[in-house]
Amino acid sequence: MRIANLKKAVWGLMAFASTLVCVMDCYPLIPAVYGVYCLSSGHTIIFYIGLIIGMGYFISIPSICKYLFIIAVIYFGERLFVRKSSKNGCVTTAVVAACATAVMNLSVTFLGRPDTDEIVLSVAESLVVFSMAFALCRACEYLRALEHNENPVIAGISG
């Protein structure tokens, strides 16, 4: 029981901590952490509470709207691709999170007058989201395998 509560608290802290990392007015850990959270089996309201408190305190309102849209796209993408297929969830999660971030950023960029710097920043943020989502997902698979006393390398490859 205590380990389950500890996992819920860690997910809430990860959600809150993802709002603290800001790189050039972008928050690449929010989509990455949410994508990994969608793959986990222990869904909890504490994650959303940590995310909303962190976003409300540290992020501007237009950025909150942007990342809430990205989170919605990640949720539906996860439901479509990962749950219906037997493919590797890490790669799919990373691709869905990166594509959602890129589409949202590029659509906002092309609504105005597109600048080369904004396009490069949009692509760079989606690449950072891809790499962070993949790294966090592999780390969670590794920890889950260690918890069940399996070989973490083989457990991560199988599924």
Predicted regions mapped to residue ranges:
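Hydrophobic transmembrane alpha-helices
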Residues: 1-45
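Subset of alpha-helical transmembrane segments and adjacent helix-loop junctions
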Residues: 20-32, 46-71
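Alpha-helical transmembrane segments and their membrane-interface exit regions
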Residues: 33-43, 71-82, 130
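Membrane-embedded alpha-helical hairpins and interfacial helices in multi-pass inner-membrane proteins
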Residues: 8-12, 22-27, 60-68, 79-159
